[in-house]
Amino acid sequence: MYFQHSYRTQRIANEIHKKVSIILQHKIDDIRIGIPTISGVQVSKDLKNANIFVTFINKEGPEEIDTAVMILQRASRFIRFLLANTMCIRVAPILFFKYDSSLIEGAKVCSLISTTEKL
């Protein structure tokens, strides 16, 4: 359902990535979110849905991460409204925020590799 099939969906995904990053930096002022970083965006073929994958720099526990994702999901209608005002598309996609743990897992693998090299 969320495959980048055409050049247009890739362009829209990149544009959503840029715009939502700016919106999260300047318009969403909730301390519980912390510092969100968008690691990727997947848009459906019909451009009605978008999965936004986020990571958090200063969140460590699963409860904190779940709370931050839930807050972003609750704010998704407001973010969608701001996105629709800044993008030139007929219908703004419905936004679904999901936690992306790949960066943290990659950092753990790198630290394991560096410790084995020291031995």
From Swiss-Prot:
Entry's localization field: Cytoplasm
Keyword Cytoplasm: yes
The keyword Cytoplasm appears for this protein: yes
A family per Pfam: RBFA
InterPro entries: KH_dom-like_a/b, RbfA, RbfA_dom_sf, Ribosome-bd_factorA_CS
GO MF, one example: ribosomal small subunit binding
Top-level lineage group: Bacteria
Keywords: Cytoplasm, Ribosome biogenesis
Entry-linked SUPFAM superfamilies: Ribosome-binding factor A, RbfA
GO biological process entries: maturation of SSU-rRNA
Gene Ontology cellular-component annotations: cytosol
UniProt function note: One of several proteins that assist in the late maturation steps of the functional core of the 30S ribosomal subunit. Associates with free 30S ribosomal subunits (but not with 30S subunits that are part of 70S ribosomes or polysomes). Required for efficient processing of 16S rRNA. May interact with the 5'-terminal helix region of 16S rRNA.
Annotated family: Belongs to the RbfA family.
Subunit structure: Monomer. Binds 30S ribosomal subunits, but not 50S ribosomal subunits or 70S ribosomes.
Protein name in the entry: Ribosome-binding factor A
Organism lineage string: Bacteria, Pseudomonadati, Pseudomonadota, Gammaproteobacteria, Enterobacterales
